[in-house]
From Swiss-Prot:
ADP:ATP antiporter that mediates import of ADP into the mitochondrial matrix for ATP synthesis, and export of ATP out to fuel the cell. Cycles between the cytoplasmic-open state (c-state) and the matrix-open state (m-state): operates by the alternating access mechanism with a single substrate-binding site intermittently exposed to either the cytosolic (c-state) or matrix (m-state) side of the inner mitochondrial membrane. It comes from Arabidopsis thaliana. GO terms for cellular component: chloroplast envelope; mitochondrial envelope; mitochondrial inner membrane; mitochondrion; plant-type vacuole; plastid. Residues 1-74 form a transit peptide. One of its GO terms (molecular function) is copper ion binding. Keywords: Antiport, Membrane, Mitochondrion, Mitochondrion inner membrane, Repeat, Transit peptide, Transmembrane, Transmembrane helix, Transport. The chain crosses the membrane at residues 84-111, 152-176, 185-205, 256-277, 291-311, 351-371. Monomer. The transmembrane helices are not perpendicular to the plane of the membrane, but cross the membrane at an angle. At least 2 of the odd-numbered transmembrane helices exhibit a sharp kink, due to the presence of a conserved proline residue. This is ADP,ATP carrier protein 2, mitochondrial. The gene is AAC2. The keyword Mitochondrion applies. GO terms for biological process: mitochondrial ADP transmembrane transport; mitochondrial ATP transmembrane transport; purine nucleotide transport.
Length: 385
């Protein structure tokens, strides 16, 4: 499940496995005591919460922590500030490349996922029939460049998210520093969920409004009946101005609570499934096989993401009501109304596009990292969701 804040995407797994960066190495140096699965080494967030913090995204708990100060971000001790800054910026470029490459399918996912809210608000003429229909209509009505609408906010979100990862890291590591072999599986598992929820929510608190703005821009369709085909928002700043004017700060954080719950749900499913299935399937020659481990991680990531996808749908549907006359009273009210009026399948609209997005981004990021190795002599990961 967050652009989804944040859950590991396939592209982040690929870069984490095949192309481990200096950024990820520094982060792992500060990582929590519990060892993560091989396919989950990369600091990231699954697409639904991304960035994230949810496609955050959200950030893996063992990778979010703090320096001594909750305000200032300190570079790892063994690296000079200059090298750290270069890694940080290059990680941003890498994140921008992967996010921009996947932006068209990401917008299609959001359009399909939130189309019922757009129909109710009179901002969509008729429902989309599928991924191909959504692509075709969007290009026909708005032009091919519109497929990247909302991508700027998604790229910008990387930088505060990455800084917050360092800002919150050590604090939550000290609070939930349980070891699986010493404290037992269930205590480690509970600590992992708690640290993930606390760290994810803390980071998400600062970047959630960017995810909100990205969602509103991506779903600002030009083919609407309302407004004679004109867009509702003229850009990122306009989203903030109009939302604050109509709904205040609360409008920027609609769906925040259910987003935090989504972190716990996803992490519980991911780690629970991985720890349960890996000892059974990855035995013998498969135990040390990268491809077998990657395939298992890919299946579990998408399985956990699909199971937690309804949470992402509810939070984004709640986002879409900011500025509208009728709003959901709560996340439970949103869930109940969606199921009652549209059926349970409506909670999974856009899930297929969400999987395709991860596949599309994987090859692009791997290729980009290979280019970095040739040009710079080292690889930089995206570092964040």
């Amino acid at each position: 499940m967050v652009e989804q804040t944040q859950h590991p995407t396939i592209l982040q797994k690929v870069s984490g496995q095949l192309l481990s960066s200096s950024v990820s190495q520094d982060i792992r140096g500060y990582a929590s005591a519990s060892k993560r699965p091989a396919t989950y080494q990369k600091h990231a967030a699954y697409g639904n919460y991304s960035n994230a913090a949810f496609q955050y995204p959200l950030v893996a708990a063992s990778q979010i922590a703090t320096t001594t100060s909750p305000v200032f971000v300190q570079a790892p001790g063994e690296k000079g500030f200059t090298n750290f800054a270069i890694d940080f910026m290059m990680g941003g470029v890498s994140a921008a490349v992967s996010k921009t490459a996947a932006a068209p399918i990401e917008r299609v996912k959001l359009l399909i996922q939130n189309q019922d809210e757009m129909l109710k608000a009179g901002r969509l003429t008729e429902p989309y029939k599928g991924i191909r229909d959504c692509f075709g209509r969007t290009i026909r009505d708005e032009g091919i460049g519109s497929l990247w609408r909302g991508n700027t906010a998604n790229v910008i979100r990387y930088f505060p998210t990455q800084a917050l990862n360092f800002a919150f890291k050590d604090y939550f590591k000290r609070l939930f520093n349980f070891k699986k072999d010493k404290d037992g599986y269930w205590k480690w598992f509970a600590g992992n969920l708690a640290s993930g929820g606390a760290a994810g929510a803390s980071s998400l608190l600062f970047v959630y409004s960017l995810d909100y703005a990205r969602t509103r821009l991506a779903n600002d369709s030009k083919s609407a009946k309302k407004g004679g085909g004109e867009r509702q928002f003229n850009g990122l700043v306009d989203v903030y101005k109009k939302t604050l004017k109509s709904d205040g700060i609360a409008g920027l954080y609609r769906g925040f609570n259910i987003s935090c719950a989504g972190i716990i749900v996803y992490r519980g499913l991911y780690f629970g499934l991985y720890d349960s299935v890996k000892p059974v399937l990855l035995t013998g020659d498969l135990q040390d096989s990268f491809f077998a481990s990657f395939a298992l991680g890919w299946l579990i990531t998408n399985g956990a993401g699909l199971a937690s996808y309804p949470i992402d749908t509810v939070r984004r549907r709640m986002m879409m009501t900011s500025g509208e006359a009728v709003k959901y009273k709560s996340s439970f009210d949103a869930f109940s109304q969606i199921v009652k009026k549209e059926g349970a399948k409506s909670l999974f609209k856009g899930a297929g596009a969400n999987i395709l997005r991860a596949v599309a981004g994987a090859g692009v990021l791997a290729g980009y990292d290979k280019l970095q190795l040739i040009v710079f002599g080292k690889k930089y990961g995206s570092g964040g969701a």
